[in-house]
Design a protein with these regions (language model features):
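Thiolate-centered catalytic microenvironments shared by cysteine-dependent enzyme domains
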Residues: 18-26, 82-182, 198-199, 214
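Positively charged, proline/Ser/Thr-rich regional signature most characteristic
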Residues: 20-100, 176-248
């Protein structure tokens, strides 16, 4: 019947999830499995999978999801930088994303690279963005539906953004140096080995290495996974507050 709540345990879990989301500064950004399943056939929603392991998508993905490879699609292939304005517009066009499309990202490793994709979309001021809480691994653990069928999409219009929002949301060398000298909070989300200087890059990412080992003076180590539960969902607002209070 229209308007009836989901059955039994699913309804209880969804209420708990909604309460968790409501405590965040931007609860509208997070969605759960029930939300995804309600919007699988929504033409105004594009689900995007972006993983550390770029081969995972082909082994099965959420029905209708497209694949964005963080190395090939989001990074400049010549210089160490993000794609430029026209590259972003072309990425959206070929993946069936318009200016008004709601883009929902998810991926492996507690949404590590999915959130990277989310950030790149923010860099170009795409308005409607969401993250599937728990990402790919949580979806699979919940027996969420998977398919190997790759959606066939016709290109759609997407205007070239007037500029990349570098000044608004990126910190460059001079910004970070001034921040550190002022003893303001700095969080290093890399691996403990990279933070200590034991390694200059994670084995999987030689192209992401640094010239010198160690960390910026005054920075606190708080690896990405610290913000996630064992089931890959994000920790609660209260848990996150404690983590960053200790580290800052």
């Amino acid at each position: 019947m229209t308007g009836c709540p989901p059955p039994g345990g699913l309804w209880v879990r969804r209420l708990a999830m909604n309460e968790k989301f409501a405590a965040y500064a931007h609860p509208e950004v997070l969605v759960d499995r029930a939300w995804i399943e309600e919007h699988l056939d929504d033409p105004n929603v594009r689900i995007v999978e972006s993983n550390e392991d770029i081969l995972l998508y082909d082994t099965g993905h959420i029905p209708g999801a497209v694949h964005i490879d963080w190395r090939r699609d989001l990074q400049d292939q010549t210089v160490r930088d993000y794609i430029r304005e026209e590259g972003f517009a072309e990425l959206c066009r070929r993946n069936g994303i318009t200016e008004s499309t709601t883009v929902v990202v998810y991926g492996d490793k507690s949404n590590w690279w999915a959130c990277y994709a989310f950030w790149v979309f923010t860099l170009f001021a795409h308005k409607n963005l969401k993250v599937l809480d728990g990402g790919r691994d949580h979806w699979v653990a919940q027996d969420g539906p998977l398919t190997k069928e790759v959606p066939s999409l016709e290109p759609v219009p997407y205007p070239t953004p007037p500029k990349r929002r570098d000044a608004e949301i990126r910190a460059f060398f001079v910004d970070t140096l001034a921040h550190a000298k002022a003893a303001l909070p700095l969080v290093d989300v890399r691996s403990p080995g990279e933070f200590s200087g034991e390694v200059t890059h994670m084995p999987e990412y030689p192209q992401e290495g640094v010239l010198r080992g160690g960390h910026i003076p005054g920075a606190h180590s708080c690896p990405w996974k610290t913000a996630a539960n064992d089931d890959d969902t994000f920790k609660s607002k209260e848990e996150l507050a404690k983590i960053y209070e200790v580290n800052l």
